[in-house]
Amino acid sequence: MRFFWLNFHLPYACRDSGICCTSGWPIPVERSSVSLIEDAIARKVIPLRVEPWLVPAGDPPDDVAGLLAVRDNGHCVFFEAGERGCSIHSVKPAGCVHFPYVCLIDQRGVHVTLSHYCPTAASLLFESNDPIAIVEGPAPVAGDSIEGLDARDSLPPVSRDADGKLMSFDELDRWQRDQVAGAKIDEFQSDDVALFERARAAVPPPWTWPEAPSQVESLCWSLVAPKWHFFSDALTRYAAAKAYASWALYMGDGIDAAIESARIAAAVLRVEAARQCGWSGRELDRELLTEAIRQSDLLLVHYADPQLLATSSKDRQQD
């Protein structure tokens, strides 16, 4: 199996920020991992402070034993503040192993991108000086268990140039490279709030996401726009990451859904940048843009239902 990456993501390596351990997420634990974790506890490798460490999950798949327990502050029971990394790093569940990787698997191979909610992944957007390119690289995780959208049994999307004709995978490759090469994120657009609302609408209950700031356009022009162009390189890399390996290609209306998904991502970022600048009361800087990027991917990658997000444009056209 071949693995493809955006070149600026290739240097990714965990820097133990702990964000994946402290976000309060429900992490499923595979039945095969339970005895390994119990053995680690029995050897006193782990200073366990919460019992039980495994809690029930509502109607889980057959291979899931339950969820990792979290403390009242949302921290995983196996996360120790002030310590580096996870107490069960060598035996942690698959959901932990795969963060922040987001994979699309199709007949061409595995297309790897990252969730920039991870601070380390977000920092990579600011660190590369090379032209953006899709390159072949290593497997994101050890072993054969790659998680992601498995579209290997799916046909390629329909070409926009020929009515009803499926693209070849070579054509899809060329289209994707063109999308990545031309990716960019402009300043505030008139339909940003409407696009942002479509992302919010894709968040399934009981999860929610806050509305756009009431003065979002004013905030964008007064605090975001004056500094936006200073971060054009990082913004272009983020745009490329949203154009690359889009699940919407297979979950939505093909090419059109992937393009619309990238438009939604750009709008979400502009709204979240305005939110960060409004909260801080200062013009956009790297710290505020980084947090806006992180919050954008928290919504787009982790909160929104990818199926709802991919089909939102088609549903809107039918309305």
Name each model-derived stretch.
Residues 9, 25, 84, 88, ...:
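Conserved aromatic-histidine-acidic binding/catalytic patches
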